[in-house]
């Protein structure tokens, strides 16, 4: 499988290429610079893998929660690329992706990922490890006062 994924909903900007079991990524902590960084990241990943966009199987993007502008950047770019290359698109919860990383790197059965929502609040959710090893949301993703979490 060949999958390109973008994440721009937080202060970090990243693009990753999953190519037959191997992951290559570009990552930069760069608040408010995502619109300048993400396209060169995509170009770099595809060039390094000697791939053209139409050779991918699908595109994915972090659907948030997170920065409204950041989510729109990734969603807009992915939708435009997908339309032009006739590729399917998969939106992925940013919190679920964070929980999945916890499960990949530990034996933990639960993860509580949090993202700064500004103004003293956080986006968060409780995830449990499913029987298949995948992050399963328990309840719903919410925004709450940081002191309540």
Label every PLM stretch briefly.
Residues 60-94:
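DPxDG-like acidic metal-binding loop motif
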Residues 11, 64-65, 117-120:
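Short glycine-rich anion-binding loops that position phosphate/pyrophosphate groups of nucleotides
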Residues 88-149:
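Surface "functional belts" at beta-alpha junctions
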Residues 1-63:
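N-terminal beta-alpha supersecondary unit
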Residues 42, 77-81, 98-102:
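Buried hydrophobic packing segments
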Residues 20-22, 86, 108:
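A generic structural signal for alpha->beta connector loops
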């Amino acid at each position: 499988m060949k999958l390109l994924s973008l994440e721009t909903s937080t202060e970090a900007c990243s693009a990753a290429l999953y190519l037959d079991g191997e992951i290559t990524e570009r990552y930069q902590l760069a608040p408010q610079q995502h619109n300048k960084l993400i396209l060169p990241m995509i170009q770099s990943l595809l060039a390094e893998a000697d791939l053209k966009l139409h050779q991918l199987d699908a595109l994915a993007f972090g659907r948030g929660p997170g920065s409204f502008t950041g989510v729109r950047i990734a969603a807009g770019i992915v939708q435009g690329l997908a339309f032009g290359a006739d590729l399917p698109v998969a939106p992925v919860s940013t919190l679920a992706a964070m929980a999945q990383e916890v499960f990949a790197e530990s034996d933990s059965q639960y993860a509580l990922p949090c993202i700064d929502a500004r103004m003293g609040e956080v986006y968060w959710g409780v995830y449990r490890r499913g029987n298949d090893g995948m992050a399963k949301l328990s309840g719903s993703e919410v925004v709450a006062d940081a002191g309540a979490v």
